Amino acid sequence: VLSNNHPLARKSMITVKELKALPLILRSASSDTRNLFRAHLESHNMSLDDFNVILEIDNIGTIKNLVRREIGVSILSRSVCLDELKKGSLSVLPIENLSMVREINILYHRDFRHEDLLQTILKEYNKAIRNYAV
C-alpha cells in the first residue's frame, strides 16, 4: 500500500527489490498479513531484516494515515483499504512473485446434516469476497 502521490503508484506491480528500498511501516508481529508476508520472504531465503522497517504499529488507521502522508509504504490487506481506493487516496500494488492468499476452511462435525445451511454460508461468503474486488 502506498500513497497515490508516490512515484511507484502508477506502476501495475512492485518488485521486492523496489520494496526493500522504501521506508516500510508494518503491523505488529501478531498480524496475519505480516505473518503471510514474513512466511513468503522466508520461503525465498529473505527476512524482514532485509527491509527498511521504520515503524511497527498495530493500528491500521494510523498506518494508512502515515502512508497517505508519504511517511512510508505498508503491507496491508486490500480489504482494509477499500474506502481509500475508492477515494483515490491510496494505491494497492501487488508484489511481483508474491501470493498472499489466505486459505479459509469451514469445519463441521461429521454428524452435521444441514448441507443446505453450508451451501448458504458458502454462497454468502463468495458474495462477500466479490464485494472486496475493486
Give each language-model segment a name.
Residues 8-9, 23-45, 115-116, 132-133:
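Secondary-structure junction motif
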Residues 1-3, 12-20, 88, 95-103:
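Short Pro/Gly-enriched coil loops immediately N-terminal to beta-strands
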